[in-house]
Structure formats: structure tokens, C-alpha cells
């Protein structure tokens, strides 16, 4: 068996490719079932965010398993495998383990050290558990990835002052507004008429950072006004107007800065929609949705300045240099966590032999106990029988403790295989098909 990951990210694919592979939560169960339906895939878990799609699997054969995942991605996205392959990365075994730990720690994020990715890894694990696509291997790996992500943030300064996608979007707005005034600096948003489309987690973060950057008020549009009102209630000192999404055209006509972050499958703003509006001032659109909420053709509309998540790199690069040294320090911690998981993985090789050894000892114990009890006669009480049985089990456990601990302990694979061979010969342990790992 092998752990493998196949995916793409902001490092390997532009947003127009990433949005085609995005897997929303409502279709996650179906996608996981499709993956698990392949005879090569034993366990599966999917991480889908605005900047990456990664599929982690436990497979029988790494080459065949990775090929199966690529075929799934091609079918899901509608892209030919040949067109998709240049954007994909694939790792297996220790490289796959190391990659997941880097992702959970925020070292592979567009915004180095950002905290939201850890929540997304937790969600990946929760969905895998709910849809029963995880087994003991990936469940152990994801659990360790989450604990590693927490440890990196608590034991290093990586998370200190880290920006998020939402805060980078607000900074991009400040930067572009400053550049429009001939300034290479971030300027306040107090004079901007700001709107946020969507009322989810990303929109919550947008409101938080808009308030911090001086926005005097925000319009929140959402299909469900009640959800927008619930969001606004968390910002009592920020004037927030809540409107239904049908008022979007009004906001497009009156606002100067609009952020979009919805789960819509198709763009909600395009050139045709904008061309019908009677605007008298410029409009800046910043889209952090994947799939994109704003169509690429809006760039052809005069007075409209549109940006998507890939444009956030301009802001991120201004903040990254000072964090690189901290990231290098965090990598040492990740290396230790990866070794720990791989040592556990290697120890699984001993499990079938240990199980057969325990089974053999239990058969001997049970047989000899029955012989002894039969000689005790009817005067031997039930309580005394329980004491003798507990004694026999205790003796077996004491005898097995040292060899079992030795077989499970970290060691070169050749040493463990030699030890397993010796134990199997000494105790005449015959392997059966059910106990042999694929």
C-alpha cells in the first residue's frame, strides 16, 4: 500500500484552470464515492480551496493509483488528461506525507503561514470521516497533519501577523487605490463606497479587515438576507447595510469598490451586465471566489478595474520576505513530524506477524487453561476460575511485551524484516491471506 497525493495549486495552475476542478461541499460525497469505487483506491480525502485542489489516497500501486486520480480529475473538470497533466503534481509515500504537513502548516500557501488552511484541512478530515472514505492510514495522517499545523503556529512565529486571502484582498484594494493617485502605498478606504457579495467565512474576514482599514460602511449582499444580517450583527461598530442579491445592479451602479466571495458555480458579474448600467465613476472589483464570481470579459468595460485571487500575489510578495526565515525554522519541526509518521507506517509491517503470534499464544493459553480447570474438579469456584484465567492472560502479556515492543520500534526495514523472519520461524507462524497486506 502507498500514500499518494495528486493535485494542483496557485503554484501550478492559473485560476481559470483551478476553478474547473473545484469540488464544492455539496458534491464531496459523490466525488469521494467515485474515487473509492476504483479498485486501486483504498482510502481517499479531498482538499478543495480557492487556491488548491488536492486528492490524498491510499492506493495499492502508486503509478496505477495516481493514474486513476488523474482520470477522475479529467472527467470531473471536462479537461483532457493531456491538457490537465502539465498543471498537476503527484507525490507518493514520504513526499506525499511531507507535502500535506507543509500544507497544514501554511508553508505552501499563497499567504505564507495563513491560518485558514488549517481549518480547511480539519474540514477535509471531517468530510472524509462523515462520508466513510477514510481508513486507519489517512485518518492517522490527517490527525497528525492537524496537530502539526497547530504545533507550528504555537511553537514558532510563523502565524504571528500572517495575512489571509481576505486581508490580502483588502490590501490589494488599498494598493490599487493608492496607485490610481500616483502613490506606491496603501491608502485608507474611508471615502470608498464598499460592497461585499456573499456572507460566508471569507466575507466575515473581509468585513473584519475592511473595518480595520478604515471603511466607513459596507453593503453586504446575499441570496439570504437573514444570513447577511447575522453576519452584520457581529460588527456592531461598523455600519452595515444588508440587501438581497437582486440589488446587485444597484450596488454596481453606486459603489466604487466591490468584493465578491460566493459559492456560485458561474460568474454573477460579466461584461453584459455591466454594460447595461449607467455608471458615472470608476469601479474596482476584487473577486476571491473560486470558481470565479466575476467573468474575465469585464476587463473590456471602460472604468472597470477587476482582479481575481491570482492578483493577490502582488500584495503577498510585499509581506513575504521577512517570514521566509521563520518558515525555514518551521520546516525542521515538520521534518521531525514526518519521520514520526513514517516510523509508525513502517511499524505496520509487523502487525500481521504480531497478530499471528498473539493468536498462537492465546490458543496455547486457552488449551492449557481448559486442561488445568478440568483437573480442579467441581469444588473449584467460579471466582477461583476467573483468578486463574486472569493469571494466565497476564503471563502471556508479560512474555509478549518485550518482543512485540521490539518489533514495533523504529529501526531499519532490513532489521525489522530479519526480526520478523526469526519470530515466524521460532513460533512456526504461518501467514494466511487475510493477514497479508496488499
Swiss-Prot record:
Keywords: Chlorophyll biosynthesis, NADP, Oxidoreductase, Porphyrin biosynthesis
One example of a Gene Ontology biological process annotation: protoporphyrinogen IX biosynthetic process
UniProt-annotated binding residues for NADP(+): 198-203
Positions annotated as active site in the UniProt record: 50
Molecular function in Gene Ontology: glutamyl-tRNA reductase activity; NADP binding
Function comment: Catalyzes the NADPH-dependent reduction of glutamyl-tRNA(Glu) to glutamate 1-semialdehyde (GSA).
Protein name per Swiss-Prot or TrEMBL: Glutamyl-tRNA reductase
Organism whose genome encodes this protein: Synechococcus sp. (strain WH7803)
Source taxonomy: Bacteria, Bacillati, Cyanobacteriota, Cyanophyceae, Synechococcales
Gene label: hemA
